Each structure stands twice: as C-alpha cells, then as structure tokens.
Amino acid sequence: MSKRESSKYKIDRRMGENIWGRPKSPVNRREYGPGQHGQRRKGKLSDFGVQLRAKQKLKGYYGDLREKQFRAIFAEADRRKGDTSENLIGLLESRLDAIVYRAKFVPTVFAARQFVNHGHVTVNGVRVNIGSYRCKAGDVIEVREKSKQLVTVLEAVSLAERDVPDYIEVDHNKMVATFGRVPTLSDVPFPVVMEPHLVVEFYSR
C-alpha cells in the first residue's frame, strides 16, 4: 500500500465526511478531524473557507491530486465552452484512473492510479501507464491478461458497496470497460455532495 493510499482515511477525517462511502471510514465512528485535538468545536466557515473546503474535498476524492495538477484541470475546464463546473467534473471523470476505479477493477482511486502506473491497463489495446490519461467516449479500457488474477482486482470486482455508473459499460468476467460518454455532475455517483460551482468561485476570486 502506498503512502498516498494509506492517507485516504486522513482525508475523510480532515473533511469530516466519508467521501468515498467506505464502510471502514473512521468518520463513521466519530465526528471530529484527525489529531489529538480534533474534538475542538469548529466555528462557522467564511465564504472563502466554504469554497476552499469544496475544492479540497473534490481534489481529495480523485486521489488527493496535487494543487498544480488540479489547477491545470480547472484552467482547461474554464477555457472550454459551457458550464465550467460541469466541464470540471467531465474532465475529472474522463481520467483513466477514475474510470478504472468506477469500473470496480480496484478498491480505491489511490489503488487505481497505482494500478495504471504499473502498466496493468490498456486503452483500445495499447498499454497506458499514466493515471491522468484522458479517455474519450467509446474508448475501451481492459485489464491486461497477466494482471487479471491479481488479488486486488479479484477482491475489487467482488465488492458490492458501490455500483458502476451507467456511462461506463463493464464486463467483469472479461475485465473490460467501455467509456460510453463524458458524464455530467448529476450522473456521477458521489457518496457525498460535491459542489464544483464553489470550486469555480474559489479560482475566480
């Protein structure tokens, strides 16, 4: 387990929410942040604080993305025609690691990034080892033959705690997924409320 994967519950505690809907999340048992003094009562957040928290939650959900990387994704979303917040979600959900996670080939988004980086996945028959690789509608994502018996994959496929969204078609017997379309915010099965419009406000200050 990577250090970034092991930090996933710290993100839950910091946000005070079970952002991936995991049964073992510590916030299912307590209502305070990480650290010895997490029990301290929090004051009301300012508008800036609310916007920052929305950004940190969305950034954390997709594997605790680096700020520089997340800002670049936002900048592209802002350049595109249409609603910037919807563009942002579409770009994040088009990432290869996000699709591997959504397809239930791995248990966590952190594991998805590592899985892709280690060369276990192909896109349209070509091995891709970059988690941020942007998939297009119609792309076929497959777990490589020699990787299909990995314990991590077999355990993830058997999990019933999350459903595959309808914009991804998956054959778990063959471990093949087709990215049907770029989703909108309402399509994405977030376990908690995500507010990308507040992220837009944060970067538009």
UniProtKB/Swiss-Prot annotation:
Q: Which GO terms describe its molecular function?
A: rRNA binding; structural constituent of ribosome
Highest taxon in the source lineage: Bacteria
Can you cite a GO biological process for this protein? translation
> What are the residue boundaries of the S4 RNA-binding domain, all occurrences included?
94-157
Which residue windows does the record flag with biased composition (Basic and acidic residues)? Answer: 1-16
Name the keywords, alphabetized.
Ribonucleoprotein, Ribosomal protein, RNA-binding, rRNA-binding
Stretches the record annotates as Disordered: 1-46
GO cellular component terms listed in the entry, alphabetical order: small ribosomal subunit
Q: Which CDD domains match?
A: S4
**What PROSITE patterns does the database record attribute to this sequence?**
RIBOSOMAL_S4, S4
HAMAP family, alphabetized: Ribosomal_uS4_B
Q: What does this protein do?
A: One of the primary rRNA binding proteins, it binds directly to 16S rRNA where it nucleates assembly of the body of the 30S subunit. With S5 and S12 plays an important role in translational accuracy.
Give the family this protein belongs to, as stated in its UniProt record: Belongs to the universal ribosomal protein uS4 family.
Self-association and partners: Part of the 30S ribosomal subunit. Contacts protein S5. The interaction surface between S4 and S5 is involved in control of translational fidelity.
This protein's name = Small ribosomal subunit protein uS4
Taxonomic placement: Bacteria, Pseudomonadati, Pseudomonadota, Alphaproteobacteria, Hyphomicrobiales
